[in-house]
């Protein structure tokens, strides 16, 4: 795997510095305890119908059962994203933009056998994920870098596929898709799963604004994704509305001891129609 890029821990802006600081300090049990279930640490939400029996029965085991069920739904979400990456072969190279602690990157390598580059602003996340790669014996194929996803330094047309899993709300979409378009080989695939506010609703609702403040992010309008893709040679080939599929996850998480307090805000945002959870896949032309 090429190691020639320069890793720079200096954020490109004050805002990026605040994001790096946030994730360097983050040690939320809803991320860590779920990852300890099977060693795949995710930083995204889940989809699918839960097994509601986990919140019933023996209170002594309910916490563990609920944790496992939340993790199952988050892993299912990652699998659904990977299903849309297209024809990735072992000789290809792909990138996880906003990789967190690396869960989806390891899943991608196991599925495709290819090289995976993970990118995060957080030194803590990168160090954690690289330690995981060494423990798994795949450090020669899966590597994590403290880099700005808007300016990675990777070679032009070096990637077969790139994905953002709930990380686009931290960047300008035109800048992001310009860099992704540069990195993707012609015919390569880009996939994102993201929350976005519904243009039909108007401006961001109070619930969406609360989510922005909670995560120090800037949720984009749905239309913004398609405008920025069109401007950067990314042609959508699939759009899947996952809003209804993610609401049960949030209802289960709200009942969990791992709830962080933001759950009811997400439920309100989704059920009011002001917020949507989408998968968008696009081809580089």
From Swiss-Prot:
The lineage of its organism: Bacteria, Bacillati, Actinomycetota, Actinomycetes, Pseudonocardiales. Signal peptide: none annotated. Belongs to the geranyl diphosphate 2-C-methyltransferase family. One of its GO terms (molecular function) is S-adenosyl-L-methionine binding. PANTHER family: GERANYL DIPHOSPHATE 2-C-METHYLTRANSFERASE, ZGC:194242. SUPFAM superfamilies: S-adenosyl-L-methionine-dependent methyltransferases. Its cofactor is Mg(2+). Keywords: Magnesium, Methyltransferase, S-adenosyl-L-methionine, Transferase. It holds the Pfam family Methyltransf_25. This is Geranyl diphosphate 2-C-methyltransferase. Its EC number is 2.1.1.255. GO terms for biological process: methylation; terpene metabolic process. Catalyzes the SAM-dependent methylation of geranyl diphosphate (GPP) to yield (E)-2-methylgeranyl diphosphate (2-MeGPP). It catalyses: (2E)-geranyl diphosphate + S-adenosyl-L-methionine = (E)-2-methylgeranyl diphosphate + S-adenosyl-L-homocysteine + H(+).
């Amino acid at each position: 795997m090429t190691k020639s890029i320069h890793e720079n821990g200096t954020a490109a802006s004050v805002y990026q510095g605040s994001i790096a600081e946030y994730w360097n300090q983050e040690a939320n049990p809803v991320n860590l305890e779920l990852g300890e279930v099977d060693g795949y640490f995710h930083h995204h939400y889940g989809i699918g119908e839960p097994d509601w029996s986990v919140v019933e029965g023996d209170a002594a085991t309910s916490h563990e059962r609920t944790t496992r069920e939340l993790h199952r739904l988050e892993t299912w979400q990652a699998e659904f994203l990977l299903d849309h990456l297209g024809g990735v072969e072992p000789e290809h190279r792909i990138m996880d933009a906003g990789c967190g602690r690396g869960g989806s990157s390891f899943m991608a390598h196991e599925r495709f056998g290819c090289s995976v580059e993970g990118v995060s602003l957080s030194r803590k996340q990168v160090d954690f994920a690289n330690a995981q790669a060494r423990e798994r014996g795949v450090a020669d194929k899966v590597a994590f870098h403290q880099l700005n996803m808007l300016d990675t330094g990777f070679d032009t047309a070096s990637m077969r596929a790139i994905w953002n899993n709930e990380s686009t709300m931290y960047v300008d979409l035109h800048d992001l898709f310009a860099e992704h378009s540069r990195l993707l080989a012609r015919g390569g695939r880009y996939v994102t799963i993201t929350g976005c506010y519904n243009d039909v609703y108007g401006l961001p609702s109070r619930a969406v604004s609360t989510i922005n403040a909670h995560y120090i992010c800037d949720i984009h309008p749905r239309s913004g994704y398609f405008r920025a893709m069109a401007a950067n040679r990314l042609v959508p080939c699939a759009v899947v509305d996952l809003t209804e599929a993610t609401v049960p996850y949030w209802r289960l998480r709200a009942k969990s001891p791992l709830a962080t307090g933001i759950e009811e805000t997400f439920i309100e945002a989704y059920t009011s129609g002001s917020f949507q959870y989408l998968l968008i896949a696009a081809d580089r032309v």
